[in-house]
């Protein structure tokens, strides 16, 4: 065996037989190229061992594999489990992700920063008020202070009112049929709203910034962004018997009106 590992010419004359000899020879050879060259230049008795022949030729075939690291068969499932992304968390299954989350966050940050800059310059403006009032007409002063006030106060409040119901992520817990909606609060921190499917109320009239009401809170989602359409149907309650009967009655009434 030592002669075979060192590539000695005496290894050719040694009889190699049995499974242990073939496996030890395969482990002793340092690389596929060395094993192939040594196996091609040697000959000896061989026999079938689990689909491979013993001897140097069998060892060469055992080592004739790609140079990358091989993962044992019994590890493949574990490695595949670690590398497989999961959409489940302690909050439930992730069924929706808003594509405007970064834009909402960036616009609100910009609005807050401009408000802070405006508030920083207000003391300086007030100190220079006497000099400005003498040279600038009163209407222009009113317009100027109105613009400053809108940037510092009105714009952040308006943006928060518009985007407070925008859902960043939505989770669903199937066992309890509850949902968890993640939104931004006034301080740009993520806040959660937990509600049951029975708490979902669809507004009678269409609202630009409201898709449904969860208890008393208005939430905004984009139906197109649901990877599974059934999740949106179940969220809105469109799979309930009451809604199906209502739609059938509505379609029948419309059909009768068209016939008349």
From Swiss-Prot:
Pfam families on file: TMEM70
Predominant subcellular localization, coarse grouping: mitochondrion
One CC-aspect GO term: mitochondrion
TM helices/strands, residue ranges: 103-123, 142-162
Tissue expression pattern: Lower expressed in the heart than in the liver (at protein level).
Cysteine disulfide partners in this protein: none
Membrane topology: Multi-pass membrane protein
Subcellular location: Mitochondrion inner membrane
Keyword terms: Membrane, Mitochondrion, Mitochondrion inner membrane, Primary mitochondrial disease, Transit peptide, Transmembrane, Transmembrane helix
Function: Scaffold protein that participates in the c-ring assembly of mitochondrial ATP synthase (F(1)F(0) ATP synthase or complex V) by facilitating the membrane insertion and oligomer formation of the subunit c/ATP5MC1 through its interaction. Therefore, participates in the early stage of mitochondrial ATP synthase biogenesis and also protects subunit c/ATP5MC1 against intramitochondrial proteolysis. In addition, binds the mitochondrial proton-transporting ATP synthase complexes I and may play a role in the stability of its membrane-bound subassemblies.
Name of the molecule in the record: Transmembrane protein 70, mitochondrial
Lineage of the species this protein comes from: Eukaryota, Metazoa, Chordata, Craniata, Vertebrata
């Amino acid at each position: 065996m030592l002669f075979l590992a060192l590539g000695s010419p005496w290894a050719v004359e040694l009889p190699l037989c049995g499974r242990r000899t073939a496996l030890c020879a395969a482990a002793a050879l340092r690389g596929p190229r060395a094993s192939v060259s040594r196996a091609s230049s040697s000959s000896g008795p061989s026999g079938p061992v689990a689909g491979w022949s013993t001897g140097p030729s069998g060892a060469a075939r055992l080592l004739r594999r790609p140079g990358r690291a091989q993962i044992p068969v019994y590890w493949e499932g574990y490695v595949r489990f670690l590398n497989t992304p999961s959409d489940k968390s302690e909050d439930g299954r992730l069924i929706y992700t808003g594509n405007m989350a970064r834009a909402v966050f960036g616009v609100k940050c910009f609005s807050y920063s401009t408000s802070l800059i405006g508030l920083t310059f207000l003391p300086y403006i007030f100190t220079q008020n006497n000099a400005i009032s003498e040279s600038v007409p009163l209407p222009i002063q009113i317009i100027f202070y109105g613009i400053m006030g809108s940037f510092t106060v009105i714009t952040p409040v308006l943006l928060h009112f518009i985007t407070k119901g925008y859902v960043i992520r939505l989770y669903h817990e199937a066992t309890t049929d509850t949902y968890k909606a993640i939104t931004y609060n006034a301080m740009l921190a993520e806040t959660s709203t937990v509600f049951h499917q029975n708490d979902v109320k669809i507004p009678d009239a269409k609202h630009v910034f409201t898709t449904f009401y969860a208890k008393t809170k208005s939430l905004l989602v984009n139906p197109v962004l649901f990877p599974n359409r059934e999740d949106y149907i179940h969220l809105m309650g469109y799979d309930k018997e009451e809604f199906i009967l209502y739609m059938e009655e509505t379609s029948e009434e419309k059909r009768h009106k068209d016939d008349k």
